[in-house]
Amino acid sequence: MSAACISYFGGKKLKLTHSYAGKELKHWNQAAFISGIERLLGLYKPETTLKQMNMMTSHDTDRMLDTYGGDEKRLKLSVIFSFLFPGAINIYYGEELGLPGAFNAGTRQGMPWKNEKIWDKDLLGLYKRLAALRKGDEAIKHGKFEFLKEYCDGRALAFRRSSGGEALLCLMNNSSSEVNLALKQGALGNKPGAVLNSGVKLKPAGPKKLTAVLAPWAYAVYRL
């Protein structure tokens, strides 16, 4: 999962000083990313996937900030996808603070507990909100994952987690240009309300229709 996220969200900023499983990662377009994730989900039974550990980084990889070429906008999209993906997320210490570091030499330094000036408080806040959301939501912990391909246009990415009567829908814009998505009636529920939103606006587009306007690198999570 982490290799797929890096290949897709990294884009032209992708920067690695090592290989993953002996393979050099290259930029994936959206079609390749969706295909790769669906192939991964097809390898195991759903109940097995929910128990697997999703390691984003470790002491044997570059830190996320370096991997994404210092581009925090791309990093955040990858973090959100990883938190909402089935399985048990594993966060290497310091990633939530935006610590930099290349493989080996820069990934094993001590935690800067006493130097809060270098902490990225905005990124830390996002991690905290995602952790709280994940902890309290059955759809994320136990639900089905699916891409909403009618809203995946090469720039905008949409996916849903659902379990019983609970569901979450995530929209994100993995591009540097604004995206307008025409949403079907009821796509975001009867009373759309985002539990997480940065740069997504909903506009009426006729009787019971909405247009989601996604700013560059925007994201939003809606409880359905």
Each model region followed by its residue ranges:
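Acidic/polar loop patches that form or flank catalytic/metal-binding clefts of enzymes
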Residues: I89-Y93, E138-E146
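Hydrophobic, well-ordered secondary-structure elements that form the walls
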Residues: H59, S82, G94, L130, ...
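C-terminal beta-strand-rich structural cap/linker in extracellular carbohydrate-active enzymes
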Residues: A205-L224
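Short, solvent-exposed loop/turn segments at secondary-structure junctions
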Residues: S58-D62, L97-L99, G164-E166, N174-S177, ...
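Active-site-proximal helices and loops of the catalytic beta/alpha 8
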Residues: M1-Y44, F81, P100-R129, L133, ...
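Carbohydrate-binding surface patches
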Residues: L148-A187
